[in-house]
């Protein structure tokens, strides 16, 4: 059962291949994504994050979800030596982590319903669980950032998450906090991890690091990466090819 919506201004796809799949469970995940969008969208003037940025919401009045996300952002900043930083010129923007977090939390809803085979995707960031309709691993294409209609790599996933960071993507403006400027050394980096939340936050940080970001991913246990540079050349971590065979 495959369903698609537009949420957060992005395409959202949920595909459950278990035979007992029902719309009610999938709609619950969509509702959760709407809830996250209302809290964290920097485009909505009445979102919780917008209220915070305008100084209209004191810390003591922040929701538990907001407090959790901001805490996770601070932890990620420390883990990435400051390259993951949600403070951009005085504005708080946790979008480099929220999408992956939302997808991962959404998959927990499906798991609680007893589903084991599904994928959940928001604009290319995916959590893939179990197997597809053919009983095989899920196939995920990596777009060519120079030609979005072209797939340059196909990876095979089960019980993994994948996320891509790149300034060619909608709404992506990743800052290099070390230079206090927009990160522009590379075009994109795709990260495979144990779940999409982890992949998303580290992909954001690795992109901000520029060319050395692939070395950062190489050093993370359980993660692999694929980087496309400005000259259209690509480099990957040592274990990335395991997912392309």
Model-identified regions with their sequence ranges:
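Mature catalytic core of soluble alpha/beta enzymes
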Residues: 1-245
């Amino acid at each position: 059962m495959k369903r698609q919506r537009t949420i957060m201004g992005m395409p959202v796809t949920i595909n459950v291949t278990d035979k007992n799949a029902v719309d009610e469970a999938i709609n619950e995940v969509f509702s959760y994504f709407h809830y996250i969008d209302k809290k964290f969208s920097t485009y909505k003037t009445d979102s919780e994050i917008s209220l915070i940025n305008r100084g209209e919401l004191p810390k003591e009045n922040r929701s538990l979800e907001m407090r959790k996300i901001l805490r996770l952002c601070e932890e990620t900043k420390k883990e990435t030596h400051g390259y993951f930083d949600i403070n951009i010129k005085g504005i708080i923007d946790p979008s480099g982590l929220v999408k992956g977090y939302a997808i991962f939390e959404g998959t927990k809803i499906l798991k609680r319903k007893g589903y084991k085979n599904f994928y959940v995707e928001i604009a290319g960031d995916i959590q893939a669980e179990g197997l597809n309709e053919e009983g095989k691993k899920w196939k995920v294409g990596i777009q060519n950032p120079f030609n979005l209609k072209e797939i340059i790599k196909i990876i095979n996933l089960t019980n993994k998450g994948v996320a891509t960071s790149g300034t060619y993507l909608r709404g992506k403006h990743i800052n290099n906090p070390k230079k206090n400027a927009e990160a522009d050394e590379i075009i994109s980096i795709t990260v495979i991890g144990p779940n999409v939340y982890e992949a998303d936050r580290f992909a954001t940080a690795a992109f901000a690091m520029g060319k050395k970001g692939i070395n950062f991913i190489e050093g993370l246990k359980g993660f692999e990466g694929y980087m496309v540079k400005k000259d259209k050349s690509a480099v990957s971590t040592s274990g990335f090819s395991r997912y392309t065979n």
